[in-house]
C-alpha cells in the first residue's frame, strides 16, 4: 500500500511540474492581436497618401493652384469637382495663341437662366512660394466653360470700335477672349459680375486688367503683365480649368497664371 501511495504522489508531482511548465511558456508567447489591431497604423498611412496627391494628376478634392483665390470665405459644402491644366507653362506670343474649345448647347439652360456661360466673378491672388512663383487672375463662370483664346498683343483694342484700351505701366498685354460667353443680364442693362478686384491690381507680374468687350457672345479682357523692363520678357503663362462648388454656386473657373520669376 505504501508503494502505491508513493507512485500516486510521484505521478501527481510530475503532472504539477508539466502544468507549471505550460503556464510559463504561455506567459512568454505574445497573444494574437485582435482583428483590426493594426488599423490605426494603416489608417495613418492611408491618410498620408491622400494628403499628398500627385501634382501631375490632381484629385477632384485636392486644393490646386486654380482654387487658391476664392472671392469669399469658404463655406460648408465648398469643394473642387475637377481640375486640369489646359495650358502648361509656355509663351502664347503674337501669332501663336492658345485656344481652348468647349462645346455647349445654346441655350445652355432654359429661361429664365442665361443662355450662355455667364461671368459671375473675377478673383486675383499672388503665389510667391510656388515653383515657379506666379500671379493669378481667375474668371469664374456659371453654366459651363466657354471657349477662349489667350495671346500676347502689342495693344489692347476694344471690340467693335477698335479704339485703344489703356493699360498704363505694364510691360506686356495678354488678351483673353471668351467665346460663347457673356457678362451682362438678359436685358443688357447690368453686369453679372458680382465680385472683382480693382482694375489696378499692382502685383509683380499681374499689374492690372481691363474689359475690352461684351457683345454677341464674345467677352474680352486685357491683362497687364509686369512692370516695363529694359528688354521684352517673354512671360510664361499657365491656364487651369477648375469646376467647383463655391459659396453654394456651381462655378467653372478659368485661371490665368503668370510666371512672376522675372520680378522677384
Question: Can you say where each PLM-predicted feature lies in the sequence?
Answer:
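Bacterial N-terminal signal peptides that target proteins for export
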Residues: 3-18
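Intrinsic disorder/low-complexity segments enriched in polar/small residues
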Residues: 8-9, 41, 71, 242
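Long, low-complexity, serine/threonine/proline-rich intrinsically disordered regulatory regions
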Residues: 15-17, 31-35
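C-terminal motif of bacterial Sec signal peptides marking the signal peptidase cleavage site
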Residues: 24-27
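Short linear recognition/processing motifs and adjacent strand/loop elements at protein termini
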Residues: 29-31, 59-264
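Extracellular mucin-like PTS domains
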Residues: 37-64
Amino acid at each position: 500500500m505504501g508503494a502505491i501511495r508513493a507512485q500516486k504522489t510521484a505521478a501527481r508531482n510530475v503532472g504539477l511540474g508539466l502544468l507549471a511548465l505550460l503556464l510559463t511558456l504561455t506567459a512568454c508567447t505574445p497573444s494574437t492581436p485582435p482583428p483590426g489591431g493594426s488599423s490605426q497604423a494603416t489608417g495613418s498611412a492611408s491618410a498620408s497618401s491622400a494628403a499628398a496627391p500627385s501634382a501631375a494628376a490632381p484629385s477632384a478634392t485636392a486644393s490646386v493652384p486654380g482654387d487658391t483665390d476664392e472671392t469669399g470665405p469658404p463655406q460648408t459644402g465648398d469643394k473642387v469637382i475637377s481640375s486640369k491644366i489646359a495650358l502648361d507653362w509656355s509663351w502664347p506670343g503674337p501669332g501663336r495663341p492658345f485656344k481652348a474649345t468647349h462645346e455647349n448647347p445654346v441655350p445652355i439652360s432654359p429661361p429664365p437662366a442665361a443662355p450662355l456661360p455667364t461671368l459671375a466673378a473675377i478673383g486675383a491672388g499672388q503665389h510667391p512660394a510656388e515653383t515657379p512663383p506666379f500671379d493669378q487672375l481667375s474668371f469664374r463662370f456659371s453654366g459651363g466653360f466657354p471657349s477662349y483664346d489667350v495671346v500676347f498683343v502689342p495693344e489692347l483694342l476694344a471690340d467693335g470700335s477698335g479704339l485703344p484700351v489703356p493699360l498704363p505701366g505694364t510691360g506686356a498685354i495678354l488678351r483673353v477672349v471668351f467665346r460663347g460667353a457673356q457678362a451682362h443680364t438678359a436685358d443688357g442693362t447690368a453686369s453679372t459680375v458680382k465680385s472683382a478686384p480693382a482694375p489696378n491690381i499692382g502685383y509683380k507680374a499681374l499689374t492690372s486688367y481691363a474689359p475690352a468687350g461684351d457683345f454677341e457672345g464674345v467677352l474680352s479682357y486685357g491683362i497687364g503683365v509686369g512692370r516695363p523692363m529694359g528688354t521684352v520678357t517673354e512671360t510664361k503663362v499657365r491656364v487651369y480649368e477648375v469646376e467647383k462648388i463655391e459659396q453654394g454656386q456651381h462655378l467653372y473657373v478659368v485661371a490665368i497664371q503668370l510666371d512672376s520669376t522675372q520680378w522677384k
